[in-house]
């Protein structure tokens, strides 16, 4: 999933994981990579999240591959944009060696993998009072129909229809 920050990629990836978990016998693992600043720690973060045992003499990539190769599961990697190159390399290895593993990655930019299926998540439309952005604002704000919806449309346009920004603005509207 690729799209601008605040478009809802992480939230959507969590929802996808919840919806498809029954199709993956060994479940779904979620790894948020946002806190990482170095590409070298990506395999260790994934190993910790999936419970890959550390084998003496192995590096973290080998531990992750050995563990995930034995599972039919979905690995969700969120917030990959700041470490695209190391994540792409690791996902490439996982795709080669872990035939029963699915990978769903979220990023502001595509990972650039051969065979990557790219789904773009764009901001919500804010083109009128019936738009998705206005509906989200009204739903999250709890305001009733007495609000001047043209102001809400203007606000939603000003924040580019980004769901996260709309939700934050809605919570401050009281």
Spans of features found by a protein language model:
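Aliphatic-rich helical/repeat scaffold segments used for oligomerization and domain docking
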Residues: 1-174
């Amino acid at each position: 999933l690729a799209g601008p920050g605040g478009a809802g990629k992480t939230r959507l990836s969590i929802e996808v994981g919840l919806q498809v978990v029954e199709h993956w016998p060994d479940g779904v693992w979620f790894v948020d990579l946002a806190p990482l600043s170095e590409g070298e720690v990506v395999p260790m973060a994934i190993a910790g999240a999936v419970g890959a045992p550390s084998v003496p003499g192995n590096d973290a990539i080998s531990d992750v591959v050995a563990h995930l190769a034995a599972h039919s599961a979905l690995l969700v990697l969120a917030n990959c944009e700041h470490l695209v190159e190391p994540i792409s390399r690791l996902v490439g290895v996982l795709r080669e060696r872990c035939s029963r593993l699915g990978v769903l990655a979220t990023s502001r930019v595509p990972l650039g993998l051969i065979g990557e299926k790219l789904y773009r998540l764009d901001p919500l439309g804010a083109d009128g009072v019936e738009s998705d952005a206005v509906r989200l604002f009204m739903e999250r704000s709890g305001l009733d129909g007495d609000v001047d919806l043209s102001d809400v449309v203007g606000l939603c346009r000003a924040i580019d229809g980004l769901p996260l920004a709309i939700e934050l603005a809605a919570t401050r509207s009281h």
